[in-house]
């Protein structure tokens, strides 16, 4: 029962005090750094690179791989040895599945039982609200990832083995399957996928991998459980993803085709079918995959703006992708639409979205904006580059996309460290950083309501 205090303060004695969650964000960050730092040291060893790698470039590359971003300061295919490429594959897989998932797998393999706190952290990282068998859940996630990558491997091998031979063709197929499913964007070809702009098999295989990886296991698992019952029985998050993903893909494809079809440096020289294929691939890749089949440095300004918007929206929650997340964008959009219609509740698919979810979505957008603004300001101080390049590269790093407008290869030493921090924040999540800095202190006190002049 709510009680009123004489000084205008409400006390809520029957509400349970939420525990501060300052520890969880630190665990997430420490688990990330626990993989990152040793990996960076390994990449500096001669066995992993052809001509050596500085500690800064090694740290940048390791961060890009574990955060599944794909930005590179060196040519991945030419600079790294076979051992280095295998290490990058492992880092991409770890980054895509997440440190919590991989930690649980290793502990279960060695027969170690997770504590209740560890199980709670793992379930939160995997987006599970209901009680689930964590061991079974982790097994399903890993199985799904391996099966998806295996399917991609078969299709890409069919394309590349006849051209490159069994050993090289199969290795390239494996590397790019892992990179695509985990939305990492690392490619062994110097021009990314530009050599295959007219290749439907390669384009659709890679696009399929990063679309499924971007949906997330939560969505795939929900569809698998309820596909016979119908759309109505799906979780609201699944419904948002199943509608928003193809919608964003369609809008991006049409806009890229309209804006670039007459550009001789990108899609202008392609056939109509080739233009649509390139537009589709770029639209799918923009939301965190990081591959490009056309030269992005030659994109028109309007097309780059569309690319930036798609990168920022990103993929699904608990997926291998980044960005502010599709569901965050959808909730914020519907909250705005609800306000404009002067309604009291945010309703999606005949379900009322609870207020904490709405405020969390708005907080993610505000915190993300603050981080991006700060990073862009710092990069404009350290780099001699135009504002549009700085904006594109910063958002690409924050959304863990990996697409580049040409700035990454020219970054100064301070600029590289700024981008490293941005990639880390983008992968662990902006609110994780905010929780660590703000130190949440839940209170039982409720003050009287008042109005603030806005707008």
Swiss-Prot record:
The keyword Transmembrane helix applies. Residues 54-74, 169-189, 291-313, 390-410 dip into the membrane without crossing it. Disulfide bonds: none annotated. One of its GO terms (molecular function) is potassium:chloride symporter activity. K(+) transport is stimulated by Na(+). Keywords: Cell inner membrane, Cell membrane, Ion transport, Membrane, Potassium, Potassium transport, Transmembrane, Transmembrane helix, Transport. Changing residue 185 to S: Exhibits very low K(+) uptake activity. Changing residue 324 to C: Increases Vmax for K(+) transport. PANTHER family: KTR SYSTEM POTASSIUM UPTAKE PROTEIN B (PTHR32024:SF1), TRK SYSTEM POTASSIUM UPTAKE PROTEIN TRKG-RELATED (PTHR32024). This is Ktr system potassium uptake protein B. It comes from Vibrio alginolyticus. The lineage of its organism: Bacteria, Pseudomonadati, Pseudomonadota, Gammaproteobacteria, Vibrionales.
């Amino acid at each position: 029962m709510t009680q009123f205090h004489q000084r205008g303060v409400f006390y809520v004695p029957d509400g349970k005090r939420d525990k501060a969650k300052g520890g969880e964000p630190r665990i997430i960050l420490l688990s990330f750094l626990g993989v990152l730092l040793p990996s960076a040291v390994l990449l500096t060893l001669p066995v992993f690179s052809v001509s050596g790698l500085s500690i800064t470039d090694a740290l940048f590359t390791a961060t890009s791989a574990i955060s599944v971003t794909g930005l590179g300061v060196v040519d991945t295919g030419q600079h790294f040895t076979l051992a280095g490429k295998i290490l990058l594959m492992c880092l991409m897989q770890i980054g895509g599945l997440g440190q919590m998932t991989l930690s649980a797998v290793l502990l279960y393999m060695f027969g170690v039982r997770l504590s209740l706190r560890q199980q709670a952290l793992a379930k939160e990282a995997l987006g599970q609200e209901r009680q689930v068998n964590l061991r079974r859940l982790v097994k399903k996630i890993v199985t799904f990832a391996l099966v998806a990558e295996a399917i991609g491997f078969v299709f890409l091998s069919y394309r590349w083995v006849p051209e490159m031979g069994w050993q090289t063709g199969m290795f390239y197929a494996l590397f790019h399957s892992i990179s695509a499913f985990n939305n990492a964007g690392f490619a062994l070809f110097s021009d990314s996928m530009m050599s295959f702009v007219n290749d439907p098999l390669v384009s659709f295989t890679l696009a399929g991998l990063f679309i499924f990886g971007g949906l997330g296991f939560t969505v795939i698992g929900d569809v698998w459980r309820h596909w016979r019952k119908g759309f109505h029985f799906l979780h609201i998050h699944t419904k948002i993803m199943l509608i928003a993903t193809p919608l964003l893909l369609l809008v991006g494809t049409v806009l890229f085709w309209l804006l670039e079809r007459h550009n001789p440096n990108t899609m202008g020289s392609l056939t109509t079918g080739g233009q649509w294929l390139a537009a589709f691939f770029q639209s799918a890749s923009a939301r965190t995959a990081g591959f490009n089949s056309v030269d992005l440095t030659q994109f028109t300004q309007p097309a780059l703006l569309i690319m930036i918007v798609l990168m920022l929206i990103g993929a699904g929650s608990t997926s291998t992708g980044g960005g502010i997340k599709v569901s965050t964008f959808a909730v914020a959009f519907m909250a705005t639409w609800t306000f404009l219609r002067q309604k009291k509740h945010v309703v999606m698919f005949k379900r009322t979205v609870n207020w904490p979810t709405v405020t969390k979505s708005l907080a993610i957008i505000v915190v993300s904006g603050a981080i991006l603004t700060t990073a862009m300001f710092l990069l404009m101080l350290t780099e001699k580059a135009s504002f549009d390049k700085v904006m594109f590269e910063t958002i690409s790093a924050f959304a863990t996309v990996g697409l580049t407008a040409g700035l990454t290869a020219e970054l100064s030493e301070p600029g590289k460290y700024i981008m490293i921090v941005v990639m880390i924040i983008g992968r662990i999540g902006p609110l994780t950083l905010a929780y660590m800095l703000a130190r949440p202190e839940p209170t039982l006190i409720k003050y009287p309501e008042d109005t603030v002049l806005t707008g």
